[in-house]
């Protein structure tokens, strides 16, 4: 299913969830520092860069496109961390690891909406996300637990609050 938004087409899965993709953008392979971007709705809050998938777009391709648009970085795409479900907002987000190899000085969202970006230690990133973006904070828990993907489907517990199923 698709819906047109003013400047984009939203895509939905069979359950009516918006299909999204995002990356945990790490400064290096040690995965100690992650890049967060300012929210377009709440510029004083930090979020993981990501967004809606285009029709017929593979999740990995969408993830790379979104981080370039939102965070102004390019890099080496790594493993799928998981597919995360936000029942409140009806989103399913494919989250990947990306090792940053190039940081653009000017990028689409910095020019168009004044979006900012900043490197955070993992613990700090979790702290700034857990209040207003608990599902995004859970990305790091899944990463830390190090569950491996089973044919692209992560094998992870669903032990998050009732307003979100956490990880599918």
Curated annotation (Swiss-Prot):
Subcellular location: Cytoplasm; Nucleus
Binding positions for substrate per the UniProt entry: 10, 18-20, 39-41, 89-91, 115, 133
Binding site for Mg(2+) 3: 66
Keyword Metal-binding: yes
Active site: 69
Coiled coil: none
Annotated control of activity: Diphosphoinositol polyphosphate phosphohydrolase is inhibited by fluoride and InsP6.
Catalysed reactions, as listed in the record: diphospho-myo-inositol polyphosphate + H2O = myo-inositol polyphosphate + phosphate; 5-diphospho-1D-myo-inositol 1,2,3,4,6-pentakisphosphate + H2O = 1D-myo-inositol hexakisphosphate + phosphate + H(+); 3,5-bis(diphospho)-1D-myo-inositol 1,2,4,6-tetrakisphosphate + H2O = 3-diphospho-1D-myo-inositol 1,2,4,5,6-pentakisphosphate + phosphate + 2 H(+); [phosphate](n+1) + n H2O = (n+1) phosphate + n H(+)
InterPro entries in the record: DDP-like_NUDIX, NUDIX_hydrolase-like_dom_sf, NUDIX_hydrolase_CS, NUDIX_hydrolase_dom
Cofactor, free-text remark: Binds 3 Mg(2+) ions per subunit.
GO biological process terms on file: adenosine 5'-(hexahydrogen pentaphosphate) catabolic process; diadenosine hexaphosphate catabolic process; diadenosine pentaphosphate catabolic process; diphosphoinositol polyphosphate catabolic process; diphosphoinositol polyphosphate metabolic process; RNA decapping
Taxonomic superkingdom: Eukaryota
Placement of sequence motif Nudix box: 51-72
GO CC term (a single one): synapse
Assigned EC number: 3.6.1.52, 3.6.1.61, 3.6.1.10, 3.6.1.62
Primary location class: cytoplasm
Residue ranges of every copy of the Nudix hydrolase domain listed in the record: 17-142
Sample GO molecular function, one term: inositol diphosphate pentakisphosphate diphosphatase activity
Cofactor(s) needed by this chain: Mg(2+); Mn(2+); Zn(2+)
N-acetylmethionine modified-residue sites: 1
Record-stated family: Belongs to the Nudix hydrolase family. DIPP subfamily.
Subunit structure: Monomer.
Protein name: Diphosphoinositol polyphosphate phosphohydrolase 1
Gene source species: Rattus norvegicus (Rat)
Name of the gene: Nudt3
């Amino acid at each position: 299913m698709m819906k047109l938004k003013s400047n984009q087409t939203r895509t939905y899965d069979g359950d009516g969830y918006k299909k999204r993709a995002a990356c945990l953008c790490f400064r290096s392979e040690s995965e100690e520092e992650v890049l967060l971007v300012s929210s377009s709705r709440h510029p004083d809050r930090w979020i993981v860069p990501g967004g809606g998938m285009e029709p017929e777009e593979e999740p990995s391709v969408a993830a790379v496109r979104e981080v370039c648009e939102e965070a102004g970085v390019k890099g080496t795409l790594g493993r799928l961390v998981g597919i995360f479900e936000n029942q409140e907002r009806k989103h399913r987000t494919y989250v990947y690891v990306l090792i940053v190899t190039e940081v653009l000085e000017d990028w689409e969202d910095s020019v168009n909406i004044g979006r900012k970006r900043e490197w955070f230690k993992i613990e700090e990133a979790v702290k700034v996300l857990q209040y207003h973006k608990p599902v995004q904070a859970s990305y790091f828990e899944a990463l830390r637990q190090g569950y491996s993907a089973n044919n692209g489907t992560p094998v992870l517990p669903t032990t998050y609050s009732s307003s979100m199923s956490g990880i599918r």
